[in-house]
Regions:
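Pyridoxal 5′-phosphate
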Residues: 1-379
Length: 379
């Protein structure tokens, strides 16, 4: 059976260049980067090189890069380690569970946590954000750069201008979950005025189990994982060097190829949406309009009235089409999307949405097969 993977926002296959680098590093490197002997020094040199290459791709400095086990740990490190003691935390209403649950944990511990509203397409209300921050004690602001389910891109430039208009006493540290943004739209975290940003290698063709937290030198961060003092004391534990080396290759290529990726996936996504509209009566696109610059080019969140993701996703899988009914970070469960519930959709509609996310190598032939399967299963 020919299978079609349209769940690239969950993970995208390891690209050949990253795989080659992973295997090279596994064979070539036998030392611990923290050891002082020759093998350790060679490993340290490779680690430093990967750090500098990722930093250059992101437009930041190598000493500001902290390696983690993935995007979830990077987000947790920013939320728990970047929120000053006794200071408030402000989060977007549609955050990934790794931010949402971290915020809930702080709230249970007595911290003031504020949810910032969004419009019906998932765009952050910057006027409400500024009103919530003005006159308050400076804390931490965490808003995802791009939503993993809707594909909505946050108004980062508007947010920057709002924050610049605040007094120093009220201006928070600013963290963004950039896991879905990397390689899909051009952005530079430092130019935007961010203080911290989280990334995940496997979303851009790198290996699983590697994340990056960029933390500007000016931002105070407390470590959450302590022990041997690796990563300049910010994240203890021996680094997964072969995977980090492969991640550097994948991130470099994702940034270098971003313009081509954006153009190609936007064109294919628009074509896919037109076919869905004509094939499935009542199908509705959630999030920004298909041509909007506020939408990730590869992501469609489609509401299919009367559908139930608990039944539909496995049925589509049996036919060879791999999609999701929301975020992949739910232990394999198919629950009503918290994102859609937060937007005011009822539980039935929140179960009736499919996320289709294209990748770098998605072909027109695969999309034709996907439409055939959708038409047969849902039409």
């Amino acid at each position: 059976m020919n299978r079609v993977h349209l769940d690239h926002n969950a993970t995208t296959p390891l690209r050949a260049e990253a795989r080659a680098e992973l295997l090279r590093a596994v064979d070539a490197l036998r030392g611990n980067p923290s050891s002082v002997h020759a093998a350790g020094r060679a490993a340290r040199a490779e680690l430093d090189d990967a750090r500098e290459r990722i930093a250059a791709a992101l437009g930041v400095e190598g000493e500001e890069i902290i390696f983690t086990s993935g995007g979830t740990e990077a987000n947790n490190a920013a939320i728990f380690g970047g929120t000053p003691q006794g200071a408030p935390l402000y989060v977007g209403a549609l955050e990934h569970s790794s931010v949402r649950e971290a915020a809930e944990a702080l709230k249970r511990a007595g911290r003031a946590v504020h949810s910032l509203p969004v419009d019906p397409s998932g765009l952050l209300d910057t006027t409400a954000m500024k009103a919530a921050l003005e006159g308050q004690k400076a804390g931490l602001l965490s808003v995802m750069a791009a939503n993993n389910e809707l594909g909505t891109i946050s108004p980062l430039e508007e947010m920057r201008l709002c924050l610049e208009g605040l007094s120093c006493a009220s201006r928070p540290l600013w963290h963004a979950d950039c896991v879905q943004m990397l390689g899909k739209r051009r952005f530079a975290p430092r130019e935007l005025g961010l203080d911290m940003a989280s990334f995940s290698a496997h979303k851009v063709g790198g290996p699983l189990g590697v994340g990056v937290l960029w933390c500007a030198k000016s931002a105070a961060l407390s470590p959450r994982v302590v022990g041997g003092g690796q990563e300049s004391g910010m994240r203890s534990g021996t680094e997964n060097l072969p995977a980090i080396a492969a991640a550097a290759v994948a991130i470099e290529l994702a940034v270098a190829e971003q313009a081509l990726y954006t153009e190609r996936t936007a064109r294919l996504s628009a074509s896919l949406w037109r076919e869905i509209q004509s094939s499935i009566p009542g199908a509705r696109l959630l999030g920004p309009a298909i041509e909007s610059p506020a939408r990730l080019p590869n992501t469609l969140c489609v509401l299919l009235p009367g559908a139930d993701g608990r039944v539909l996703v496995p049925r589509l899988d049996l036919e060879g089409l791999e999609v999701s009914a929301g975020s992949a970070c739910s232990s394999g469960s198919i629950e009503p999307s918290p994102v859609l519930l937060a937007l005011g959709h009822n539980e039935a509609d929140a179960r009736a949405a499919l996320r289709l996310s294209l990748g770098r190598d998605t072909t027109e032939e695969e999309l034709r097969l996907a439409i055939k399967i959708l038409r047969t299963t849902c039409g």
